[in-house]
Amino acid sequence: MAVPHFSVSIVARGSGRSAVLSAAYRHCAKMEFEREARTIDYTRKQGLLHEEFVIPADAPEWVCSMIADRSVAGASEAFWNKVETFEKRSDAQLAKDVTIALPLELTAEQNIALMRDFVAGHITAQGMVADWVYHDAPGNPHVHLMTTLRPLTEDGFGSKKIALLGPDGKPVRNDAGKLVYQLWAGSTEDFNAFRDGWFACQNKHLALAGVIADRLAVRAE
């Protein structure tokens, strides 16, 4: 089995990153970066085995229309350009970037099924877009996954922060009576649950493939 790896970073302008540039690199594609009026071309990059751009089942009409009749890379280009246009700040956070090592014991088809299962249960089910690519580097099959930091709304994008709800479904207030907010896309405290969700999903698919039981206790360091 490959060394377990599951890391999350933020694509942020403040660190010199761009969602469109990141998407073009991962999709090995040529994309127009509308905000800077320039073309990004990674078509000579190799290693792309599979790519998908997945939206939530209840995604707004504008998202459905945007990606209709587009290639996967084309849908990615259109969506991340819209994110780049929406975010005005010079230090804006644009996307969550996840890198995942895939198990060597699974075939490419089985790893794709594994990713689809994880995306359905942990990304799109949370209302997030999942833009993912499968790179088949020798001895290191892995996935790059970009997800949204804001909820999708009928008019575009919502707030990154939402009111924290208590067990009774009502908004939580602090001692001063003010609403308590949380990040819609999850905080650093939610990372362990997100990561563990991946390894649980991976373990399930390893078991389905008949991998011996002692391989199923893999966890990230």
Predicted regions: what they are:
Residues 1-221:
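N-terminal nicking endonuclease/strand-transfer module with a His-rich metal-binding environment
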